[in-house]
Each structure stands twice: as structure tokens, then as C-alpha cells.
């Protein structure tokens, strides 16, 4: 999450998006909590709506990540244990983890009755692999150096990225999760618009189900 080619990192974008959504939901009178994680949960603020809580949340988001490898499985298991009431869970991550690890991790949240909205944060260079000269690439999470010819590996890279993205979206459809891709050169207002549309669509689905249930009673 520490990679960035647009003047700021994916982590910076994700924290700003989380702060924006937290401020918006708090302004609506909703209780808002926070989890930050890499290979484990780093910060946990239970959902609350009281004086000073939003400031605590913003201060927690200002802390820089450790840069270690992201692992969704252990943190999301812990999150599902800590959330006591059903509610809205917004997950913001680059999701660059094996697809077969994502479904059980996300499934714990939906199985508990939570509404889940997922933002996959990617840098534009990760989508296009817009490099042209052979060079050393550093995996910013594992810190491994790899000497690669971008033109030679671009087709294979893009094929694997497309397969990974399709796998993530299929998992979200199966679990009833609203999925959005947030590219870091995209204005945050558009991500907020995606969030609002997700909530609006969810409300329509719930109302339709309620109406059908009432008619059959």
C-alpha cells in the first residue's frame, strides 16, 4: 500500500478516503469505528458517536503504516470477532493477496449479517504497468529487488491482474458485497459518489424484500 506514482501513495489515498467516509457518516449521526491493519490489526477504535471520537479516528488515520506485508485473513478474522452488532463495514485495501484467501475472510463479515462495501485502491501504474526501460523494481512490502524488462512482462502482468480482478469481483457478487475500484488519480468525490450509490441500491433491495415478505404474510 506504500507505492505511489502520482505524488502520494495508495496508503495516503486510502486513509483520506476513510477519513472522508468517517466524517460523512458521523455527520449523519452514525456511530463510526476504525480498524487499520497490515498482517494484523494495528489500530482499533470501536464504533461510537460522541464528542471527541471523530478527532481520535482522524489522529489514528494520520499514523503511517509499517510497510509490512498485508494479509487479510488474520485481521478480518479479528475484526469479525470484535464487531458485536451488525452494521456497515467499509473495507479499503489494494487486495493484492491470493484470491483464494479473500472469500473466507470476507465471508466471515457477511455471514455475521454485516453490509460490506469494498474499495480496491490501485495506483494507475499498477493497472497499466506503464514502464518502458528495464530496471530494478522493489516490492515495497517484502523489500525484494527484482530486475525486470517491463515491455517483456507487461502482457503477462496485465493478464494476471485481469484474472485477479475478475476473481475478486466474482467473490463479491457471491457474497453480496458492493465492489468499487478506486484508482489513486481519480478524484475522491467519485469514490464518495460510488459509496452513496451502493447505499442507495442496498436500501432499494431491502425495501423490495420487505414488501415481498409483507405481501406473503
Please give the residue ranges for each predicted region.
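Exposed, interaction-prone extracellular/peripheral surfaces
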Residues: 1-217
Amino acid at each position: 500500500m506504500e507505492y505511489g506514482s502520482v505524488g502520494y501513495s495508495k496508503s495516503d489515498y486510502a486513509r483520506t478516503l476513510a477519513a472522508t467516509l468517517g466524517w460523512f457518516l458521523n455527520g449523519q449521526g452514525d456511530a463510526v469505528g476504525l480498524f487499520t491493519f497490515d498482517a494484523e490489526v494495528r489500530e482499533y477504535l470501536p464504533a461510537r458517536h460522541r464528542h471527541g471520537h471523530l478527532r481520535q479516528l482522524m489522529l489514528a488515520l494520520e499514523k503511517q503504516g509499517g510497510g509490512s506485508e498485508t494479509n487479510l485473513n488474520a485481521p478480518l478474522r479479528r475484526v469479525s470477532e470484535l464487531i458485536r452488532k451488525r452494521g456497515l463495514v467499509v473495507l479499503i485495501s489494494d487486495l493484492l493477496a491470493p484470491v483464494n484467501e479473500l472469500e473466507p475472510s470476507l465471508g466471515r463479515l457477511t455471514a455475521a449479517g454485516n453490509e460490506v462495501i469494498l474499495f480496491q485502491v490501485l495506483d494507475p501504474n499498477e493497472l497499466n504497468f506503464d514502464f518502458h526501460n528495464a530496471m530494478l523494481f522493489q516490492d515495497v512490502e517484502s523489500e525484494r529487488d527484482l530486475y525486470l524488462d517491463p515491455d517483456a512482462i507487461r502482457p503477462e502482468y496485465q493478464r494476471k491482474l485481469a484474472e485477479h480482478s475478475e476473481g475478486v469481483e466474482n467473490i463479491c457478487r457471491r457474497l453480496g458485497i458492493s465492489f468499487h475500484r478506486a484508482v489513486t488519480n481519480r478524484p475522491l468525490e467519485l469514490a464518495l459518489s460510488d459509496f452513496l450509490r451502493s447505499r442507495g441500491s442496498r436500501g432499494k433491495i431491502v425495501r423490495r424484500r420487505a414488501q415481498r415478505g409483507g405481501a406473503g404474510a
